[in-house]
Every structure is written in C-alpha cells, then in structure tokens.
Amino acid sequence: MEHIYQYSWIIPFVTLPVPMLIGAGLLLFPAATKKLRRMWAFPSVFLLSIVMIFSIDLSIQQINSSFIYQYIWSWTINNDFSLEFGHLIDPLTSILSVLITTVGILVLFYSDNYMSHDQGYLRFFAYMSFFTTSMLGLVTSSNLIQIYIFWELVGVCSYLLIGFWFTRPIASNACQKAFVTNRVGDFGLLLGILGLYWITGSFEFRDLFKIFNNLIYNNQVNFLFVTLCAVLLFSGAIAKSAQFPLHVWLPDAMEGPTPISALIHAATMVAAGIFLVARLFPLFVIIPFIMNLIALIGIITVFLGATLALAQKDIKRSLAYSTMSQLGYMMLALGMGSYRAALFHLITHAYSKALLFLGSGSIIHSMEAILGYSPDKSQNMVLMGGLTKHIPITKTAFLLGTLSLCGIPPFACFWSKDEILNDSWLYSPIFAIIACFTAGLTAFYMFRVYLLTFDGHFNAHFQSYSGKKNSSFYSISLWGKEGSKMLNKNLRLLALLTMNNKERASFFWKNTYQIDGNVRNMTWPFITIQNFNTKRIFSYPHESDNTMLFPMLILVLFTLFIGAIGIPFNQFNQEGMLLDIDILSKLLTPSLNLLHQNPENSVDWYEFVTNATFSASIAFFGIFIASFLYKPVYSSLQNLNFFNSFAKKGPKRILWDKIINVIYNWSSNRGYIDAFYAISFIGGIRKLAELIHFFDKQIIDGTPNGVGVTSFFVGEGIKNVGSGRISFYLLFYLFYALIFLLIYYSVYKFII
C-alpha cells in the first residue's frame, strides 16, 4: 500500500501533457493538428481515466485503513526559511479526486460531440485538461502555498473557459467580471495565508494546526488578529464558491460552453471554496465567530440564490442560481459543524447538477437546430415547451436530476439535504425555518424549469399557433404555459390569460405580443447541421447523439445510487452483528474523530422516517405549487368555476399581484445587487479615476508646465529691456535696490 501513496504525487500531472502537446502541435504542425483534431479527445479521456482508477484505489485504501499520507520535499533557502512542497492523501483528497475525475471524464466524452462543430475544439480540450490538472493539484496540496498556486491556476482556467467565445462581447465581459470578482476574494486569501504564517511560522497543514491549537490553548496570540486572518481566508472561499456578496459572477459565467458549466460551475471549481473551508476546518472550528459567520453567509446565500432563480428565463442561469443556493447549503453545514453532511451534499449535488447541465446542453443543442446559434434564443425557456416527444431520453434524465435536486427520495440529494435540514434545527430554529422554506422554493423553481421546458406545446414555431382567424395575438408565457384555445370574452378567466401590450409583465401571466401578418405566414428556414460529413435537416428539436446521451445515462446512475454511500443508519445481519453500511462516515473517520465530540452517526428508523417525511413533504409541496401554476392552461379549463372564484378576489387579488410583481422584479433584476455594485463600486472607482486623472494633468503636470511657461514669458519681457543703454540698466538697478531696502526695513521693524 505504501508504494501507492508514494507515487500519488503524479495525480495532478497525468493530464498535463494534453495541453502541452496540443499547443506544440498547433505551433509546429498547425494544418495536420487541425485536420486530426478529433483524435485529441481520446488522450484527454484516457489520461483522466488513469487518474480516476488511481483515485478510486486510493479511496478504497482510505476506507479500509483510514490512513493519512503526506510526502514533503523541502527546499531550504537559508537557515531560517525553507519552502516545502508535497502531496497530502486523506479522505477529503480522495473524495474530491474521485469526484473531479468521474465528472471530468463524462464531460470530456460529452464535449467531443457537443463541441465538434466549433472552430475552438482543440483549444477547448487544452483548457479542460489544464483545468483538471489545476484542480487535482489543488486537492492534493499539502500546504497553503501550493493551494494558492493551484487556486490561481483554476481561476485562470475559469477565465479562459468562460470567455471561450471571446468574440462575443457579452462572453468577454462575463469572463472579466468573474476574474475581477474572484481577485477580490483571492487577495483576501493571500493576506490570510501571510497572516497565518506570521502567527504560526508554517504553511504545512499538519504543523499549522498543531501550532495554532497550542497558541490558542495557551492564550499566546492576539485572538482578534487570528479572527481577522480567518475571515480573510474565508473570503477566498466566498468568491470561489459564489457566496454572498461575491456571487455576482456565477450567472454571467454561463456564457461559456455548456460542458464547462457542468464541470467547473457545478461539480468542481465552485466546490473549491467548500474544499478550502473543509481543509481549514480544524482551524475554523476553534474560532466561534468565524463558524457563525460561515453559517450566516451560507444561509443568506441559500435563500438569495433560490429567490433569484424564480424569474429566470435562461435555463442555464436558472441552474446557476440553483448551484449558488446549494453551495450555500454546504457552507451552512460547515458553519454548523456538520462536516460530514457538507461533504455528502457536495458529492450528491455534483453528480445531480452535472446531469442537469448536460441535460440543458442537450436541450440547447436540439433548439439550435431550429433557432440557429443564438444563446438568447436557444437557452430561452420562453421558446421551449413540449419537448417531451422530441427528446424523450433527455427529458427523462433531466426529470431524474430535477427530482434529485428537489430532495425527493430515494434520489441522491434527498439523503444529504435531509441531513443538513435536520442538523439546522439543532443549530438555530431561525436558520432551520429559512433552510426548510428554501428547500420548498428549490422544488418550486426546479419544477418550473422542467415544466416550461418539456410541458405544453413547442413555442418556437409561431405559425404553428395561428389560432382562429379572429385571433391576432399569440401569448408567450414567461412563468407558465398558456393555451391557444379561444375563450369566450365573457369569461372572467380571460383577464388572467391575456394582457394588453402596454401592460408590464406580471409574475405568472406575461405580456402578449402582436405578430405581424407577414411573420405569421412566412416559412421558417430549416437549419442544416453538418457532422462527420453527413447532413441532417430538422424542423423540430431532435434527440442528441449517443455520445452525448451516454454520459447523461451514467450520471443518472450516480444520481440514483450515490446517496447510498451516506445512508445514516446501520443494519444487523443474520447473526445479529452490527453492519456499518455508512461508507462515507467510515471514510471520514479520521476527520470525524478530530472534529466531532460524538462520532456516532447512526439514527433509529423512527427518527429517520419522521425527518425524511417532513423534508420530502416540503419538496412535494413545492412541486405541487409549480405544477398548479405552470401546467398548460388548456388542461385546466374543465373547472372554470374554481378559476373564476380565484379571480373574483378583488382587493386581495390586487394585493397579491403587487406582492408577486415585487418578487418578480427582485428576481429578474438579480436582487438589485449587480446594479448596486455598478453604481457604488464601478461608478465610484470611475469617479475616483477621473479625479486622479484631473489631479495628475492639472496639478502634477500643471505645476512644472506652469513654471516653464512663466519663465518663458518673464524671459521674453526681460529680453526687451536689455537694449544696450546704460541708463536703463542704472534705472533697474536702483529699482531693485529700493525693493530690497523696503523688504529689509519691513523685516527689521517686524523683528524689533
């Protein structure tokens, strides 16, 4: 077993040859490299598969032996200072390594087909391979310096991949926004690392924790300064994991290709902040203030992300805000001290959200066959609907991922989210109420996405809904599905289904848009997609190829069964012996013994069923509300009396509409947080820059320039005096002598 750990340092560097070879090939043999570009997917997947096998083997060794291995190379600079580099293999490392490699392989396999038409195919695989190298280096780092180096490399890869289509201004702005926002957190992280080194004199985790605990126990350090360093360290995690208030970059990061959203912004990179807090958990756990701060930031992010997802029309941005909210659950769990629950939810959410992002990529891929390449259209749920019969496999996979994220048993996220909700009641009833309410919101907005995408009719073909000859309006619903059936004008339900063009959009029923007659009668062009020199012509969305469906089906299996590794109860065998089937707790045993007073994680059946019933009921209630509001209206017209009674509530209805509009505006405007940052920070910095520019030009440059100009004019004036006549020289001599005497007399009188 020792030799396995000894050679584990190679894990981050196995995939590094791929970007190097692609770069060398494009530099030396550009034509041949581009001609054989599809072959580069194989070495990317193959090398990452080797790392995956190695990581799984290490995880099995961790489960069987609970052994922590650390190997260090020391570089001595002088007698007082040396840099140490190495790798650390512990349960946290093995979990993240398996997660990165499994999701990474599936995403690369998926990307081979998804990006096959793109001119940047080679660049994409080079970036992705370099990202996996950076991420694996991050999780295997044995000290803070290595973590910071790979932390920055991960940020660079994210910048490159978000701005992959850099010719699009919106993508270019998005990658800059992500880069700058993360630099704020990274600067705090760097200051925290330096402050921690100043306190302990070490960057190595094991030495650092021991020294830090001794200093705190013996009261030999300024606790306020220690708390400040901890807050600075946590700021790096806030930015990287898109926690409030540095969350603003994540929705814009969806401008990159969809596969990177599945790998980077769902499963791995955004989880780096969770990993950092988990890695430094022995340090944070002895500082009550920082633990409370982590929990507070987590619960704010949980609720904020859920509310901002309510009104999104872009399917990827809806999933992005969902990711933000779920990362808040993980941060909340860490702040409460539920180390195991946080990592459990990290695992289950990664696979479920990767499935949802790949499913959204399949949806977008099918929509592009109709609408062409235009993210504003192909990602817009307004133009979707009725996709069940066109992409049934994608629909099934997306539904399973949605049910998992909603917290429906027995899917993966149910087990982890239920554990966090249960622990939140022990920590704070207020936090627990917010967390449970947000769990219902999660089920609501996720099923909203599902219904808007797959339910009802396909909305992209307006001519398919020409309706009756007297109908001149076609209504596209942003919040629900509206039928095309003609209703009696006397029905009061009509007020709920149609609105005047001049009216603003409400929460559930959106504006109707008048369609020009020429547009209604025009023939929509078919989109020809070339792939492997074959042509396919589509007039409706089509199912993706097998190379895109296969990774989704594998992720479906993970979504169904990965929750089994953390089932929090034990069973007895036929001989009456207690069987420990909680693999996750067994894997985390070394950490749990250090961080928890009571490592016993088993619960009885009654408690488990009671808690599970409560959390599942919340999820089902959210799904019911979403189904009630977003199912097609034409299927609900059988009970007009119910709808009419709902519509007759005059003042209450008006108040309800106002509340709904406030929520809609809050959600669609991103909680006004981006606008606040634009006005306060961006506008303030620009005003400050203008002031500095004015000071530089007018004061700094103006002073020497003014002296020079003044000297020039004085010299020109004196030049005219020098005419060569002695009488003028004597006159000026007497004049200057008189001025000197006056000054001397004034000073003398002042002194006397």
UniProtKB/Swiss-Prot annotation:
Parts of the chain that traverse the membrane: 9-29, 40-60, 89-109, 125-145, 147-167, 185-205, 219-239, 258-278, 280-300, 327-347, 354-374, 396-416, 425-445, 549-569, 608-628, 728-748
InterPro entries (alphabetical): NADH_UbQ_OxRdtase_chlpt_su5_C (IPR002128), NADHpl_OxRdtase_5_subgr (IPR018393), ND/Mrp_TM (IPR001750), NU5C-like (IPR003945), Proton_antipo_N (IPR001516)
Record-level Gene Ontology MF annotations: NADH dehydrogenase (ubiquinone) activity; quinone binding
Subcellular location: Plastid, Chloroplast thylakoid membrane
EC number: 7.1.1.-
Catalyzed chemical reaction(s): a plastoquinone + NADH + (n+1) H(+)(in) = a plastoquinol + NAD(+) + n H(+)(out); a plastoquinone + NADPH + (n+1) H(+)(in) = a plastoquinol + NADP(+) + n H(+)(out)
Pfam families reported for this sequence: Proton_antipo_C (PF01010), Proton_antipo_M (PF00361), Proton_antipo_N (PF00662)
Keyword check for Cell inner membrane: no
Bilayer topology: Multi-pass membrane protein
Biological process, per Gene Ontology: ATP synthesis coupled electron transport
A cellular component annotation (GO) from this entry: chloroplast thylakoid membrane
Top-level taxon in the UniProt lineage: Eukaryota
Assigned keywords, A-Z: Chloroplast, Membrane, NAD, NADP, Plastid, Plastoquinone, Quinone, Thylakoid, Translocase, Transmembrane, Transmembrane helix, Transport
UniProt subunit comment: NDH is composed of at least 16 different subunits, 5 of which are encoded in the nucleus.
Function: NDH shuttles electrons from NAD(P)H:plastoquinone, via FMN and iron-sulfur (Fe-S) centers, to quinones in the photosynthetic chain and possibly in a chloroplast respiratory chain. The immediate electron acceptor for the enzyme in this species is believed to be plastoquinone. Couples the redox reaction to proton translocation, and thus conserves the redox energy in a proton gradient.
NCBIfam families: NDH_I_L, PRK06590.1
PANTHER family with a match to the protein in the record: NADH-UBIQUINONE OXIDOREDUCTASE CHAIN 5 (PTHR42829:SF2)
Family: Belongs to the complex I subunit 5 family.
Stated name of the protein: NAD(P)H-quinone oxidoreductase subunit 5, chloroplastic
Organism name: Manihot esculenta (Cassava)
